[in-house]
């Protein structure tokens, strides 16, 4: 049993709606099923971001409490890697107007973003307490 999305839930209109989608999609999985989702991730600012609109940008402060909530509910969430990387291409940012066909990081408004992946396994059985 498996759910997957690539750069989609940041287009639901707000940070809150994106996180709600992640929680609700778990209901479609059987116990022990897996969900893998990627989204835009703000690496330049953990305070200010695009919180609503056509594209939102998630921050560590949005992701971490959500992950802790999932774990508290008994789901497994793979450890997240927030490192920026150490290779030369990790330090290149595709700025507006976007010219590079391939990029690891790009500018959206005043923010530098990359993709982050969430790997979630639905709890294997229902809790009775």
Where do the language-model regions lie?
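Conserved acidic residues
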Residues: 1
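A conserved beta-strand element that flanks and buttresses the S-adenosyl-L-methionine
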Residues: 4-7
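A short His-aromatic
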Residues: 11-14
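A short glycine-rich, Lys/Arg-flanked "PGG" loop and its adjoining helix->strand segment in the class I
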Residues: 18-34
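Short "lid" loop at the C-terminus of a central beta-strand within the Rossmann-like core
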Residues: 40-45
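Conserved Class I S-adenosyl-L-methionine
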Residues: 46-82
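A C-terminal cap/extension of S-adenosyl-L-methionine-dependent methyltransferases
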Residues: 81-129
């Amino acid at each position: 049993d498996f759910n997957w999305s690539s750069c989609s839930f940041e287009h639901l209109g707000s940070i809150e709606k994106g996180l709600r989608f992640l929680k609700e999609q778990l209901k479609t999985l059987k116990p022990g099923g897996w969900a893998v989702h990627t989204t835009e991730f703000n690496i330049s600012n953990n305070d200010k971001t695009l919180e609503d609109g056509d594209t939102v940008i998630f921050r560590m402060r949005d992701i971490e409490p959500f992950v802790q909530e999932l774990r508290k509910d008994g789901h497994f969430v793979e450890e997240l890697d927030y490192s920026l990387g150490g290779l030369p291409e990790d330090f290149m940012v595709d700025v507006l107007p976007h010219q590079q066909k391939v990029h690891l990081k790009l500018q959206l408004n005043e923010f530098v973003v990359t993709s982050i992946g969430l790997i979630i396994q639905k709890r294997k059985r229902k809790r009775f307490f």
